[in-house]
Amino acid sequence: MYIRYKNSSKFRRYSRLYRFTTFAYQKNKKAGVALRYHFNQGLGVFVLPYKNGHVITEIAHAYDMSDYLNDNRRTSYARSGIYWDNDTQYFSSKLEFEYFYQISEIVEQNLSRTQIMSEIIIPIKNGVSASLIYETENYRKLNNNPNSISLSIGWKGNLKWSF
């Protein structure tokens, strides 16, 4: 299970720059993650915007809280990444390379890691799409380098709520 929310906004004077906040919850026993809460916040730059997509880079402060509810222990990271999004007439694709450098010493193990994700998104109808995703994590100091393949159904649109 993977739930992710990202909010971003461009700077008015510098439209190639944006700020973002991301929250994610992940459960993947096959990859050794019983439950991970993830948060990051930072700045991004549109390095190469083009008609059907873009290449961006981001820097951020991030933290994880894994496998312990109602606790304030967390692992902090400096995060950087480069991302390529491309749209075609029939599908969209994403390729992401992220590096997390552990800056906290609360957790005894060094959890610095590289994460690579590729995704193909095929639109179905009315904002509904199918996504095929491959992810891998390579830890610097651990022998556990999990990877996973998943298929998901997504919906993109506005909620029509009124208050």
Task: Give residue ranges: language-model regions.
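Outer-membrane beta-barrel "beta-signal"
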Residues: N147-F163
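Outer-membrane beta-barrel transmembrane domain signature
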Residues: N52-S129
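Hydrophobic alpha-helical segments of small multi-pass membrane proteins
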Residues: F39-Q41, H61
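Residues that define the transmembrane beta-barrel architecture of outer-membrane proteins
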Residues: M1-I3, V33-F39, N72-A78, N110-T114, ...
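Membrane-embedded beta-strands of outer-membrane beta-barrel proteins
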Residues: I3-N7, Q41, A78-I82, I116-S118, ...
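Sequence/structural signature of outer-membrane beta-barrel proteins
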Residues: K10-R12, A24-G32, F46-L48, A62-N70, ...
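Glycine- and aromatic-enriched membrane insertion/assembly motifs of diderm outer-membrane
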Residues: M1-K27
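Short loop/turn motifs that connect adjacent beta-strands in outer-membrane beta-barrel proteins
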Residues: K10-L17, A31, L48-I56, D87-S93, ...
